[in-house]
């Protein structure tokens, strides 16, 4: 009985010590660090997760599918000054008359607010400003412009979050968001780049260029592209800072030529991705069919 009592006392002392130890851990005194900041939205991950976009700014409503720049169009909303969030009261396809660019810093495009979704067609879309969040949009440039558009592109900016976007039918590359600082591309699809369209080099149709200083690409699907699945492409602006790229939990399917390659002077994590050869891949050499990356 005494031995049992001793064991109980020892357990109580250990438990008490553990409890007192846990309560003695001081709370973090630092404020303003990245850990204390609010993420872009629930589910935002990666190096771009603290992008604020148009938070705290004005809200502009897109009420027209036209692309003439008149009030109520997406092109008009993008030209407005100051932090802004763009929401959609309409659904359907916006047939662009020329390339569309983000234009101004501190921007959120909330495609999920459209009743049935928004598709941008005929020309490419470019991120050419800082602190941008783009969510739930479809990009289908095609070859109608007679040019060589990327579906969704951009480089040399910082604080970028692209989430739940679908990009297809590009002439050059589907999804080329690279050379950014603090960026994330997540839960997106880049597929069916046009192999024989209006590109000056002839057969083309690539997946995209990926890279940047603190750049994350996760939970994306890249499928049915000739090459650059993806191309790890450094930019002079981010090489100076140090290219640090994290590529994980993506699916790469049915590449025809090269799959993933490049990576010059980059530090790249390639983790837990799924590679599945498809009908087009079977026409390539055995080396290309089962190669994860050529760097």
Language-model segments: what does each one mean?
Residues 39-86:
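Acidic Gly/Asp/Thr-rich repetitive segments characteristic of extracellular carbohydrate-active
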Residues 106, 111-112, 130-141, 158-169, ...:
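Right-handed parallel beta-helix
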Residues 121-125, 145-154, 169-177, 198-212, ...:
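Extracellular beta-strand/beta-solenoid scaffold signature
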Residues 15-32:
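Bacterial Sec-dependent signal peptides at the C-terminal "C-region" and cleavage site
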Residues 66-67, 91-93, 114-115, 278-281:
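Acidic glycine-/aspartate-rich tracts in secreted/extracellular proteins
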Residues 1-4:
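Positively charged n-region of N-terminal signal peptides that target proteins for export
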Residues 257-260, 266-271, 277-295:
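Charged/polar low-complexity intrinsically disordered regions
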Residues 74-82, 94-108, 118-135, 141-158, ...:
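Extracellular beta-strand-rich solenoid/capping regions of secreted or surface-exposed proteins
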